[in-house]
């Protein structure tokens, strides 16, 4: 079994790595972290990698890899091409393993537009969206398969543990400018509706340099 969790940059993984360091050894005695390879190794042989994908070209670093689980933390920090490329890496690394992807995210960010279109507005919350795919078979026929996705909304008030441990955090969010406050406190995906073509914003990989 192999899994991988992405943040936009490796530095942003700090909090996730701290939580993994707190949870994994207690739940899986004998689990160890290799700081050079950025991977947790478990006695069963399973591995969980942590990685950044700062530039779109970084996605090809994972060409030839296979992961049973792929996770994106703060999905709106990524472009669609970075996310969709990893579909090709989401395949079983052994018999009987479950293959799936998960992502978390907040409104705003360079990927706000495509994340909203793909998950938020495509169907009501908590409603599975099923897409039919036709896979070619060796005999020339096709096989129907389905991929599912779903949007699970959550607000700060849904995290009772955080509310109890840090009640001042809500006050901090309440003091933000209106658009940021509506996005982060209320989970409002329409607060950034005026940001058109967000996937193209400040992305050096998309620039075309004219040759002279």
Go through each PLM region and give its residues:
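Alpha-helical scaffold elements adjacent to nucleotide-binding pockets in ATP/GTP-utilizing enzyme cores
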Residues: 16-23, 81-89, 114, 118, ...
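ATPase catalytic-site recognition across NTP-hydrolyzing enzymes
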Residues: 158-212
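Walker B catalytic acidic pair
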Residues: 73-74
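Conserved RecA-like ASCE P-loop NTPase motor core of nucleic-acid helicases/translocases
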Residues: 1-13
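Inter-Walker segment of RecA-like/P-loop motor cores
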Residues: 11-68, 189
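Nucleotide donor/acceptor-binding cores
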Residues: 1, 46, 99
């Amino acid at each position: 079994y192999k899994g991988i969790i992405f943040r936009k940059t490796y530095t942003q993984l700090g909090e996730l790595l701290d939580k993994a360091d707190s949870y994994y050894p207690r739940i899986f005695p004998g689990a160890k972290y290799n700081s050079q390879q950025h991977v947790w190794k478990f006695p069963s042989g399973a591995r969980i990698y942590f990685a950044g994908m700062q530039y779109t070209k970084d996605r090809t670093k994972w060409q030839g890899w296979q992961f049973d689980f792929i996770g994106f933390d703060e999905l709106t920090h990524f472009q669609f091409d970075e996310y969709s490329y990893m579909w090709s890496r989401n395949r079983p690394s052994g018999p009987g393993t479950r293959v799936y992807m998960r992502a978390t995210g907040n409104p705003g960010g360079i990927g706000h537009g495509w994340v909203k279109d793909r998950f938020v507005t495509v169907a009501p919350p908590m409603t599975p969206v099923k897409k039919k795919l036709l896979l070619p078979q060796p005999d020339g026929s096709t096989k129907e398969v389905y991929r599912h996705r779903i949007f699970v909304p959550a607000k700060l008030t849904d995290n009772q543990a955080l509310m109890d441990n840090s009640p001042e955090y809500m006050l901090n969010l309440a003091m933000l400018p209106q658009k940021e406050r509506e996005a982060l406190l209320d989970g409002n995906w329409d607060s950034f509706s005026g940001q058109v073509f967000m996937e193209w914003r400040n992305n050096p990989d998309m620039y075309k340099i004219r040759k002279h």
